[in-house]
Curated annotation (Swiss-Prot):
HAMAP family: Glu_tRNA_reductase (MF_00087)
Residue positions binding substrate: T49, C50, N51, R52, S109, E114, T115, Q116, Q120
Name of the featured protein: Glutamyl-tRNA reductase
Enzyme class, spelled out: oxidoreductase
Function as written in the Swiss-Prot or TrEMBL entry: Catalyzes the NADPH-dependent reduction of glutamyl-tRNA(Glu) to glutamate 1-semialdehyde (GSA).
Domain comment quoted from the record: Possesses an unusual extended V-shaped dimeric structure with each monomer consisting of three distinct domains arranged along a curved 'spinal' alpha-helix. The N-terminal catalytic domain specifically recognizes the glutamate moiety of the substrate. The second domain is the NADPH-binding domain, and the third C-terminal domain is responsible for dimerization.
Catalytic activity, EC: 1.2.1.70
GO biological process: protoporphyrinogen IX biosynthetic process
Site annotation Important for activity: residues: H99
Binding site for NADP(+): G189, A190, G191, E192, M193, S194
Quaternary structure, from the entry: Homodimer.
Gene encoding the protein: hemA
Length: 448
């Protein structure tokens, strides 16, 4: 069995292409089932976000599995197989495990170290698990990847430092006020940066937000979308008298907030702090306002300095996380190597315990007068003999797991002890056959 990951992401395809190869949420369960029923696929998880569509699969043969996954993606989105090959990257074995660990921990994201992808990976795994397309390997591997990512984030705090201008703007406000939940905020502008700033303010707990814009219809549209207030730009001076935070991002060619405006409203603010954050170029807020008591004025250069410093911190944290990945891959490989040994050890134990049970039956027949206490003592000691006899063979079987010729030697081991253990590959195939029947029955029932 082999682990393969096929990824269409921000490195391999532009946004126009990525938009065409994204699964709708309501189509993902059927997509999991369709792929699982495909030849060569033994387990699968599909991840589909705005920045990546990925298929993780356990396959019986690498080349066959890769082809059928690429064909599945081509058919799902109306492309040729060669098109999918051109816009995707393929990882196999250790590289596929490394890719999953990097994706889950945010090291492969456009925004380095972001945490949203961890939740998306978890949701994708849970959906696949509930659909029935995961088995022994993915149930273990995805839990390992999720645990690793959580630990990495907690130990390095990689996501704590803002690396987007809109998020950094909110972080600056937090430096002044601490918690923002009870504060009042104004968003000037109704474009993309304004919306991102609005979302970050909402994420910080602020609910009292007013959007103002020269075109009132645009302000109304943005406010309605996120269930906040809106007002005309002419109302700005009055709004400033009670505001705590102002984030401005317009394309105006002259200052929207001037020194004169702030001086007029400062008298009515009773020394309350006001944070002005200007992310527009050219600037919306007149420089020099910071000279007024309790007025904090930041522009894009201030934000860029914070973002650059934070990015350096994230890069250092990412390097620390990357150093931990080889150990995770090694741990996974050790676990995988034991998969073939466990059924052999189980079969050996079952045979030995069957012999012990037969021996006890024989003793019961030949010595019918034994008391219950005597019988328990004999049973205990015969089991002890069995365990002592099995100790060295089991140790040898475990050591075979790391041998390059482990399959051949495990087969010899089984012949010596006259036992027969089902290999993980056969177990996976039988599991798939059973689950495919369940999926088919579920579809028939749903259709009826």
């Amino acid at each position: 069995m082999h682990f393969i990951a096929i990824s269409i992401n921000h490195r391999t395809a532009d946004v126009a292409l990525r938009e065409q190869v994204a699964f709708r949420d309501d189509a993902l369960r059927i997509a999991h089932e369709d792929l699982y029923e495909t030849k060569s696929i033994l387990e699968n998880v599909i991840l589909s976000t705005c920045n990546r569509t990925e298929v993780y699969a356990v396959v019986d043969q690498i080349h066959t599995g890769r082809y059928y996954i690429q064909r599945f993606l081509a058919r799902a989105f109306g492309f040729e197989v060669d098109d999918i090959k051109a816009m995707s990257e393929v990882k196999v074995g250790d590289e596929a495990v490394e890719h999953l660990l990097r994706v889950t921990s945010g090291l492969d994201s456009i925004v380095l170290g972001e945490t949203q992808i961890l939740g998306q990976i978890r949701d994708a795994f849970f959906l696949a698990q509930s659909t029935g397309t995961t088995g022994t390997i993915f149930n273990h591997l995805f839990k390992q990847a999720i645990t690793f990512a959580k630990r990495a984030h907690n130990e390095t705090d990689i996501a704590d430092n803002a690396v987007s201008v809109s998020y950094a703007a909110v972080e600056l406000a937090k430096k002044v006020f601490g918690k923002l939940k009870s504060k009042q905020a104004i968003i000037i502008g109704a474009g993309e940066m304004s919306e991102l700033s609005l979302l970050n303010l909402l994420g910080s707990g602020i609910t009292d937000i007013t959007v103002v814009n020269r075109t009132i219809e645009n302000a109304m549209k943005l406010a309605a979308k996120h269930q906040v207030k809106y007002d005309e730009l002419s109302s700005l001076p009055n709004l400033l008298e009670s505001a705590d935070i102002v984030i401005s991002s317009t394309s105006a060619q002259s200052y929207i907030i001037t020194n004169e405006m702030i001086e007029r409203i400062a008298e009515n603010r009773k020394q309350d702090s006001l944070v002005l954050i200007d992310i527009a170029v050219p600037r919306d807020i007149e420089p020099g306002i910071s000279a007024i008591t309790n007025i904090f004025n930041y522009d894009v250069d201030d934000l860029k300095g914070l973002v650059d410093a934070n990015l350096r911190e994230r890069q250092l944290a990412a390097a620390t996380i990357s150093e931990q990945i080889p150990a995770e891959i090694h741990a996974h490989n050790e676990w995988i190597s034991m998969l073939g040994v466990v059924p052999v050890i189980r079969a050996l134990r079952e045979k030995a315990m069957a012999i012990q049970a037969e021996t006890m039956d024989s003793i019961d027949r030949k010595l019918p007068g034994l008391s219950e206490r005597e019988r328990k003592i004999i049973s205990k000691h015969t089991k002890s003999i069995i365990n002592q006899m099995l100790k060295d063979p089991i140790k040898q079987a475990k050591e075979l797991s790391s041998d390059k010729k482990s399959n051949e030697k495990l087969e010899l081991f089984q012949n010596i002890f006259d036992i027969e253990a089902e290999c993980p590959h056969e177990q996976a195939k039988q599991q798939k056959e059973s689950k495919v029947k369940e999926i088919s029955a579920r579809r028939i029932f749903s259709f009826e």
